[in-house]
Amino acid sequence: MDEVREATVQYEIPRAAPAGRMSFEEFLAWGDEDTWAEWVDGDVVVLTPANLKHQDVSLFLAGLLSEFAVFRKLGKVMIAPFLVRLPEPLRRGREPDILYISNERVSLLKETYCDGAPDLIVEVTSPESLARDRGEKYVEYEAAGVREYWLVDPDRRQAEFYRLGENRRYRSVPADERGVFKSEVLPGFWLKVDWLWEEPLPSVVVCLKEMGVIQ
């Protein structure tokens, strides 16, 4: 059987926000690979550390997406903290929980950030981030041209999937009658939504087998 790598990440105590406004370049120089913060029109917003449920769901979904993309040779999956600089005129440097870039657009990935809109962004919401993820970020990602935006709420056991239409606006794409969502940005990828709520979460290996990715 092909080797499947397990996703791991370390969570650090957030740094204090600097005083005053700064440019995006100054923000990059101020932060480091352990910085959990976003740049919003010159202001630095320090993010709250994730709770256990948020972390577990994020790692499971990131692992599933990453392994699928690797086995199918589709592109690259990144996890927070990794910055996304949204295109002008949006003055935003966001840190989504998960992002995916297809091979055709992998040149957007710089050493410490993604310079433009990824193909897919996933936000795993928390009570603190819910309004921001459903409000500000929804509008920003739509305007930036992020082709798919997934909102996963572990507390409510609710997953929402949005796809950019020809009119450049998001439309909701529900799971089918079997509770399965099929992505367009990752050809062949499908997600059984109930996987996200299982306790404990299923093995990525087991899910990949059910998807027919590995034997």
Regions found by a protein language model. Give the residues of each.
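Gly/Pro/Ser/Thr-rich low-complexity, intrinsically disordered segments predominantly at protein N-termini
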Residues: 1-215
